[in-house]
Design a protein with these regions (language model features):
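Cysteine-centered catalytic environments shared across enzyme families
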Residues: 1-333, 337-339, 351, 355, ...
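A structural signal for short, well-ordered beta-strand segments and their strand-loop junctions
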Residues: 126, 135-136, 156, 208, ...
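Active-site adenylate/phosphate-handling loop in enzymes that bind or generate adenylated species
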Residues: 140, 295, 353-414, 499-523
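Conserved S/T- and glycine-rich ATP-binding loop of Class I adenylate-forming
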Residues: 264, 369, 495
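Alpha-helix capping and helix-loop boundary segments enriched in small/acidic/polar residues
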Residues: 299, 342-345, 393
Length: 645
């Protein structure tokens, strides 16, 4: 895992690339390098910051240059040994043992045809000195980030958006439509970028820059096609051996020349991976977190720690427990900086603190259970939407009576949150809606009217544009399986837009690599070859994964109630962050600029304080958005995000 950057026919390219690379130092503290080459009346520059994981010697240093090709690469190839053997059989001679050299030689031999063969996580740029072409590539599922900015015939790229912002002299303007999307989702979708002009290279695609100024784009992997192929496979009765696929992926993800550990929450996904990893690495360290007792009680959070201890004891894992009682006022601006775009998921803080503790103990690589919920229908929203289909058949008067009764219930008392009431209110907010709208409403923060009421009225068209985009993505498939339609939408939007994005940025802020064995091309293929009826069986989500896990884990772990990799937001918002909430609501920059309406925010605060509704997540995201916007506009020298022109 590393940081990559570069310029192509960009003014003052060397200085810009040096600054880009310097901004990414946290992603690669083990080394740095640059490359330069003339290109007609311009130049190409590549930069790299190295976090050494495989082949710790100098032969793995980057940018790697060999016989007319120059490569700067961020990621890991888990099938590098197989590709190396094939290339050696074709006469290629390698200098070292890094996967970087394997990628370079695979590109030399096969060009873009090598891309579908890569199994791993990656973002890279390769320059051909003979043709003068630069190609940017991002992995199939969007695990690794790659941001770029084009101006005229020039291009600049980097692993993080903050690097582009740092070298453009404050000329990047905030995109108000992206902030609208952020408010809806509490993250910026992968199809959008918080700054106008900048973009994220889409997963499974490449972009080629030519010396004549032309740009060509291509796709080498399409999740929609994979899902459609999986549906046909399921119809034919070709059921995947899911236990074998997950076991193989976990084994491959352990490939490393430095210490590896796991996240262990005590839930199914992390417990399964940890148990499998412990087979190959006896005594492997695992990190788990807990919160201050009073915070956990206030939030009505489940006791995950006892399950993590049980797994560790059973499989001989070195469990390292971290109690999180963070100074959230201090962490909030720090995390906002590292996350690049406004992200309202407090799990990013958990990830950072765990990775920081692991790094301090000498661990560079962590395995995470990220992705299992999206691919195997493990979130509450998946089951809730399935139940909603049946709920919509209930007579209208009965539904209205139930909704009225639940609406009168409080979501919290002074001492304790009432999770069951929160869940019931959430369910009733979308249960009567059409399929796509219900699915969107089941995991986003606002409905259309609420969001428009929160924003500057001029941004209403942006709201409709964001909602239309969600509908288009959700419906863009040929699947006739409702559960797999939800899983596909999550894998295309929720996974790269939120979970993979914050995992990358939070872990790299602590100079730590996080690997995600469930977000593996072979696991994904297997996941979409499983019918929805085997993913949600009765009231059990992830049923097929649980079935596979019983070959390794005890049933009390497999079938325990679902935990939460989250944070005690209600406790933080009502105590630690209450003064900051008041400041942002009454005199924040977003309010003063007109982007957010003061009276709408004040109403949310009042209803939350009264226990009438739970707006803790909404207000947390307003805080993250405020901090992000202050930083963004201070660089740009203006403070109005409401223009959509």
């Amino acid at each position: 895992m590393c940081g990559i950057a570069g310029t192509y026919r960009w003014p003052d390219g060397k200085a810009v690339t040096d600054r880009l690379t310097e901004t990414l130092a946290h992603r690669g503290p083990d080394g740095s390098g640059t490359y330069a080459h003339s290109l007609g009346d311009g130049e190409v520059h590549l930069g790299h910051r190295r976090l050494a994981i495989l082949d710790l010697s100098g032969t793995g240093a980057q940018p790697m240059v060999s016989e007319g090709l120059a490569l700067t690469y961020n990621g890991e190839l888990y099938n590098a040994p197989e590709l190396r053997a094939e290339l050696e059989g074709a006469g290629v001679r390698f200098r070292g043992t890094s996967d970087t050299e394997v990628l370079l030689e695979a590109w030399r031999r096969w060009g873009t045809d090598c891309l579908p063969r890569l199994r791993g996580m990656f973002a890279f740029a390769v320059f051909d000195e003979r043709s003068g072409e630069l190609v940017l590539v991002r992995d199939q599922l969007g695990i690794k980030p790659l941001f770029l900015l084009r101006r005229g015939e020039g291009l600049v790229f980097a692993s993080e958006l903050k690097a582009l912002a740092a070298v453009t002299g404050g000329s990047l303007e905030v995109d108000p439509a992206a902030l609208v999307a952020s408010l809806l989702y509490y993250w910026v979708p992968d199809s959008r970028c918080a700054f106008r002009g900048a973009e994220k290279l889409p997963p499974g695609t490449w972009l080629r820059c030519r010396p004549d100024g032309s740009v060509q784009r291509g796709r080498f992997w399409d999740l929609r096609e994979v899902a459609a192929e999986g549906q046909e496979r399921a119809r034919s009765g070709d059921a995947p051996d899911l236990a074998a696929v997950v076991e193989e992926s976990t084994r491959l993800h352990l490939l490393s020349d430095v210490p590896v550990a796991t996240f262990l929450s005590g839930g199914l996904d992390s417990s399964y991976l940890t148990a499998l990893a412990a087979r190959d690495r006896p005594g492997i360290p695992a990190y788990t977190i807990g919160f201050r007792a009073e915070d956990a009680r206030f939030e009505a959070m489940p006791d995950d720690l006892r399950y993590a201890r049980r797994v560790a004891e059973r499989f001989g894992v070195d469990l390292r427990e971290i109690e999180i009682a963070p100074d959230v006022q201090d962490l909030l601006p720090r995390m906002t900086y590292h996350l690049d775009e406004p992200v309202g998921d407090p799990a990013a803080i958990n990830t950072f603190l765990i990775c920081a503790a692991a790094r301090e103990a000498g661990v560079k690589v962590m395995l995470s259970g990220m992705g299992a919920d999206e691919l195997f229908a493990g979130y509450r929203k998946h089951l809730a939407n399935l139940i909603a289909v049946r709920y919509r058949r209930v007579p209208g008067p009965v539904r209205r009576g139930v909704a009225g009764a639940v609406d009168r219930l409080p979501v919290a008392t002074r001492r304790r949150g009432l999770r069951s009431v929160r869940f019931a209110k959430r369910f009733l907010s979308f249960a009567g809606l059409p399929e796509e709208t219900a699915f969107r409403r089941s995991y986003t923060l606002y409905d259309r009217e609420e969001l428009i009421g929160l924003l500057d009225p001029d941004l209403a068209p942006a709201v409709d544009d964001v909602l239309t985009e969600h509908a288009d993505v959700y419906r863009d498939n040929v699947l006739d399986d409702f559960v797999n339609r939800m899983c596909l939408a999550d894998a295309r939007m929720f996974l790269p837009g939120l979970n993979l994005a914050y995992t990358d940025r939070s872990s790299m802020a602590a100079s730590t690599e996080v690997r995600v064995p469930y977000v593996d091309v072979e696991v994904v293929r297997a996941a979409f070859a499983v019918p929805g009826a085997r993913k949600i069986a009765g009231r059990q989500g992830k049923a097929v994964l649980k079935e596979a896990a019983t070959t390794v884990l005890p049933r009390e772990i497999v079938y325990r109630p679902k935990g939460l990799f989250s944070a005690p937001l209600r406790a933080w918002m009502s105590r630690d962050l209450a003064p900051l909430v008041r400041e942002v609501v009454h005199d924040g920059l977003l309010v003063r600029s007109g982007f957010l309406r003061r009276e709408a925010l004040a109403r949310m605060v009042a209803e939350d304080a009264a226990g009438q509704r739970d707006f803790s997540k909404h207000l947390w995201h307003v805080l993250t958005l405020e901090h992000w916007y202050r930083d963004a506009t201070s660089r740009a020298g203006h403070d109005s995000p409401t223009s959509t022109a």
